[in-house]
Amino acid sequence: MSTVQTVLGTITPNLLGRTLTHEHVALDFEHFYRPPPPDFESELKAKISMSTLGYVRLYPYSSKENVRFYDGEALEAAKKDVLLYKKHGGGSIVENSSYGLKRNLEFIVELAKSTGVHFIAGTGHYIHAMQDASHASLTVEQMSDLYSKDIITGLQVNGKVVKCGFIGEVASVYPIHDFEKNAIKAAGEIQEVLGCGVSMHPHRVTKAPFEIMRLYLEAGGRADKCVMSHLDRTIFDIDELLEFAKLGCYIQYDLFGTECSFYQLNTSVDMISDGQRIDNLIKLIKEGLVDKLLMSHDIHTKHRLTSYGGHGYHHIHTNILPRMFDRGVTLEQVEQMTVTNPAKWLAFDP
């Protein structure tokens, strides 16, 4: 029987329910801090409040408080929003914080126990620039050993063993750094052996997802167990996205709720809106790809939590799905994207 490995133990895939496949409940995103525009420096250095929130929404990576998604206030706000997610029909959350993002397994376990939401934790490596000295020079073999131990043996958290349930997010820049190539290859090798799910984070250029999949597939990884994240900010042309879809991995639109007039992490492109995300998913559904689609928010800054004026983890359930139904998407198709596909991806399938 197939199983899914949560932080509290294994369950059968049918128990997951509605699942967000790419979220964070605690991480350190200070690496991506950007100096504020001189005109708004004082507002963005101030504590987040109603009088400064508008500036933070425009320049989210220019507020140090906003990218410190790990302090006590952030954890309290994240827990509140996980409870709201549960209230509005959420069943599971896939926590994508990997090595380099300062994953907080203790907090993830506490959330799983206190909220009743299933949490699946990831192993793997984020970009090379965010690794400490103990990880920055790891070989493919060392990474493979680490990932397999995190999944099979588990890690000690307050005297108890907690096991990771997938590899991800495995992140890379472009051109892909040699360290990141090693991480992608290690993910492919371990996926082939264990049958686990894998989640990739591409850089913000169209070529990146294609190159990642080439490295992953050459290492032995299965396409049908791999998620390509952040495609709603990476491949904007639908025809090119359809070409990428031929590789057979999951197509993930995971920035729902991110609507901004200025995308700080790639100023050469305009971030699409939730309405455009819905329209693109409908186009992909019409192309017969509903069994390859996933949806999430990738919450990683405070201003996206409701305590800070944001939308929270329940945004897709309460605001997006009703709009999709209004535009002709069926309940069966929504269940496929939010329940069936996540369960198939997360189920261990050697």
From Swiss-Prot:
UniProt xrefs under CDD domains: PTE (cd00530)
Annotated cofactor note: Binds 2 divalent metal cations per subunit.
Cofactor(s) listed: a divalent metal cation
Chain residues that bind a divalent metal cation 2: 169, 201, 230
Keyword DNA damage in annotation: no
A Pfam family matched in the record: PTE
Family in the record: Belongs to the metallo-dependent hydrolases superfamily. Phosphotriesterase family.
Protein name per Swiss-Prot or TrEMBL: Phosphotriesterase-related protein
